[in-house]
Amino acid sequence: MTTTVETATATGRVARVIGPVVDVEFPVDAMPEIYNALHVEVADPAKEGELKTLTLEVAQHLGDGLVRTISMQPTDGLIRQAPVTDTGAAISVPVGDFTKGKVFNTLGEVLNVDEQYTGERWPIHRKAPNFDELESKTEMFETGVKVIDLLTPYVKGGKIGLFGGAGVGKTVLIQEMIYRVANNHDGVSVFAGVGERTREGNDLIDEMSESGVIDKTALVFGQMDEPPGTRLRVALAGLTMAEYFRDVQKQDVLFFIDNIFRFTQAGSEVSTLLGRMPSAVGYQPNLADEMGLLQERITSTRGHSITSMQAIYVPADDLTDPAPATTFAHLDATTVLSRPISEKGIYPAVDPLDSTSRILDPRYIAAEHYNAAMRVKNILQKYKDLQDIIAILGIDELGEEDKLVVHRARRVERFLSQNTHVAKQFTGVDGSDVPLDESIAAFNAICDGEYDHFPEQAFFMCGGIEDLKNNAKELGVS
């Protein structure tokens, strides 16, 4: 499975340059294969008198020895008739322990240290695992976060969509998952920044360094200011690193993509540059195929998994837009982060009613778990239905039964909050891990009214039942 860049197989000449699209002429009997990486030397505008190497990826064979390529870097300074070398292999990236704590670009170049890598590399274009290699059983991925494990359980080797605007705790939740995979599951994480703002990427690296999770994480960035070819391939580069950890090191991997919409957007730009006829809403005609090539590689093989969390931007909040709609078809769970919930100071600010999971079903989880989740959802839904009446008439106008629903729902809502490990640097409070069995027992007890006499404040930002009792004790309740 080891792959290194082969020696040059042929030399061609630049025939045409149109922005990131470069047409290259080769001898008819030495045409490079689709997805092969080509190298061309060009004057480096940053260093006078020096040359830099541009990487081009073959996208189309036009015939008569002509190939159309997409450049992975800006083509400023590239001239016609410049010699182009076929590397004989696809773009490849470093794999293995070397990648942990490092920041890479799409081409596998290290960005945060000067250390050069001479070890094993894998090509970014790889086949999905064969059907007989896939893990057949559906297993829950326990995180220790109450609201996720109880109401929107994640699938080991599944794909989770993460919805949330700015400032609702998306980055903290991502970092917390990286921390928990490293410490609770002895796993590793890979983060692919697809079309990330440079500032966002820089902030993420700084925050991960401060919270101590960066040494268990490989980061790959294709920034917003880079050509579409780079932004289209960066997710594949990150996924290739994740596949090595899964297949060779036999680890459970958490793979983050931020933002999957920008992957689609980059594909649309490349499709237009290649002259393809646009499809619905101007997207590329091969949208579903392109998404499938990425998503089908994110899966569990026998005993080991890649679990993916994908941040999803929804254009104009239109869920029927082809980009998010195509992504939804692949998701096993959706975690919606809500601004109104974060404004109450409840973190993680997961919306318990909007968030869903494929395995929140008695066929996949214990009946006790399913029943507890349904009780919590029902009580929160009733509380939501009563909000308008409370806003207009006040809580005193409700019947006794409705008052009891509101009383317990407010406690349930606050008990869904939890301190995270990575936020300790801001809060000074240790994070908590709550086993699923304890979460189920706790929420059943709250819904049964066992803790009706505890004040609401006692339920806020605590872990399990012991934390709840300690909080109540501090507030003077026995």
UniProtKB/Swiss-Prot annotation:
It is a peripheral membrane protein. Produces ATP from ADP in the presence of a proton gradient across the membrane. The catalytic sites are hosted primarily by the beta subunits. CDD domains: ATP-synt_F1_beta_C, ATP-synt_F1_beta_N, F1-ATPase_beta_CD. Pfam families: ATP-synt_ab, ATP-synt_ab_N, ATP-synt_VA_C. It comes from Streptomyces coelicolor (strain ATCC BAA-471 / A3(2) / M145). Keywords: ATP synthesis, ATP-binding, Cell membrane, CF(1), Hydrogen ion transport, Ion transport, Membrane, Nucleotide-binding, Translocase, Transport. PROSITE patterns: ATPASE_ALPHA_BETA. F-type ATPases have 2 components, CF(1) - the catalytic core - and CF(0) - the membrane proton channel. CF(1) has five subunits: alpha(3), beta(3), gamma(1), delta(1), epsilon(1). CF(0) has three main subunits: a(1), b(2) and c(9-12). The alpha and beta chains form an alternating ring which encloses part of the gamma chain. CF(1) is attached to CF(0) by a central stalk formed by the gamma and epsilon chains, while a peripheral stalk is formed by the delta and b chains. GO terms for cellular component: plasma membrane; proton-transporting ATP synthase complex. It is an enzyme of class 7 (translocase). Its EC number is 7.1.2.2. The keyword Acetylation does not apply. It catalyses: ATP + H2O + 4 H(+)(in) = ADP + phosphate + 5 H(+)(out). It is found in: Cell membrane. Belongs to the ATPase alpha/beta chains family. This is ATP synthase subunit beta.
